[in-house]
C-alpha cells in the first residue's frame, strides 16, 4: 500500500476514533432505565442498608406455573426490569436431609426422570414439582444477569431473601409408613436439592457480599475514622461521617459495587424450621456466607396486618406547628435495619399503596397472584409486575424523568449558558434539564423557572430549610442562597425524602421546589453538583468543542484525499514510458536492417 494511502486511512481512522470514543454511551431508550440509574447514582454514597427497592417472591410464580424450571423463564426479565430482591421459600426435607424448592417430598419408591413434572400431595395440598428444579437454576439466572450488567453504568445490588421452612413429620404410628414412602434407601437414593444452606448460593462466588466482607470493612472503617477525626471534611465525607454514626456500620453502595465489586447479598428473612431431632444444623460456613438477623437485622411486614401502613402514616405526619420531628428521621437513618413489606392475595399492592410503602422506606416484595389464573404462565405474572415498576421509586414521580426537549440543546451545554438558548413562542428561555420536587416526587422542569430551593444541613441529613422569599432559576443558585451550615442539595434516601416533604408541609411551601439534580451536560445522565457537574460516564462534548477537536484531523484528511485525486488524474509512469520507447525503437531498427519485400521463403 502506498504511503499516501496509509496517511489518508490513518487520518480518517483518527476522526472515526474521536467520534466513537466520545459517544461510548449506551442508548437509554427507556424512562425506567434512566430513572433507576439516576436513583442509584444519587444513593451511591449511602449505606446499602438505606437502599429501598422492589422485588418478587418466587412462590407467586411457582403457585401459578408449578415448581418447574420453565416457571423461572421470566426471572431474568424481571431482574432486568427493575426488581432487585428475590424472596425464596426453601424447604428442609427431613426425610432426605436436603434443601429443596418443592414444598412436598418425593416418594422414594418411584424412579424419576429429572425433567418430569410429578404430581405430589403433602399436608392436604397438591403440587406439581420437577425433580430437576433446584436453587442452582435460580442462581444460574442471577449469575447471567450479573455478568450482563457488570459495568459502571448497569451494575446494581441484589438481595436474596430465604424463608426457611420444614417438610416435617411427627413420630407416630404413621412414622414407619411415611419413612418407607419418602426416606431414600440404598437401592433407590433420592438426591434432590442441597445438603447445606451455603451450597444453595455458593455458585454466585465472588459476587456475594458476605458477613466476612462486612466485618473486614467495619474494622477498616474504625481505623479511618480515628485517623480522620478533627480534620476538615468535604460534602462527600460529611455524608459518610453522618451515616457512620449508625448502630451498625455498613459500607456505601458505591463501595460495595465499585470497590468491593460485590453484586448480591443473601439474608434469612424468616426461620420457620420445626425444632426436631432431624432439624437442619447451621454451620460456620452458613454464617460466613449468609446474613442472619444478629448481624444485619431484617424485618418483614405483611400487608394483611396493617402494621406497615400505620407506621408509614406516622412518618408522613412527623411534624407539628413548631417544626419537623428531625430526631425521628435521624434515628431512622442511623438505625441499620432492612425493612420489607410483602403483599398477599387478600391484600395485594395497588399503585398507591406500593408507592406509599416504598416512600416510607420499605422494600416491596410482590407475593400476590394479581388475578393471574393457576393455568396461566409465569410470563403473565411478569407482565402484571411490570405495570407496578414505575411506582416503585421513592424518588421519581411515575413516568419521570421525561424528555421535554425536542430541539438542539447545545446552547445549554455551552459554557456561557445564557446565549443562543431555546425560546418559546413568547420569547421565554426553555431548558427542561433540571429536577424539581413535586407532591408526587421528582420531575423534570424548565431550568429558567424560578422556584424555592431545597437547603440541607451538612451534618444532620434530615434537617432542611426552605426560604419562600428566596426564589431562583436553576442557573442563578449559588452557595450564598442557603443559610450557613446548609447547602443546595437533594434527598439521597427515602428517609431524607420523607423529612424534606414533611418540611414542605410544615412550612406550607408551595411545590415545585428546586433539587440539586440535572442532565444539562449529557442527556439522560442525571448528576448533582450544579449546572456544570460532569456525567461520570462520558466526558462532556459540545458542538463547538467537537468541531475544534476533529478540525485538524479533518483538514489533513481532506488535503490527503485531494493529493490522491490529483495523482490519479495526472499520473505518468516514467519507467513504463521509457520501456515503450525502447522497444518501439528496437523494432524499427530491426525492420530497417531487414527490409524484405513480400513473404520470405
From Swiss-Prot:
This is Maintenance of telomere capping protein 6. It comes from Candida tropicalis (strain ATCC MYA-3404 / T1) (Yeast). Residues 571-601 are cytoplasmic. The keyword Signal applies. Residues 1-21 form the signal peptide. Residues 22-549 are extracellular. Glycans are attached at residues 29, 109, 173, 194, 198, 234, 244, 275, 302, 320, 331, 367, 375, 405, 414, 420, 457. Residues 405-425 are annotated as: Disordered. May be involved in telomere capping.
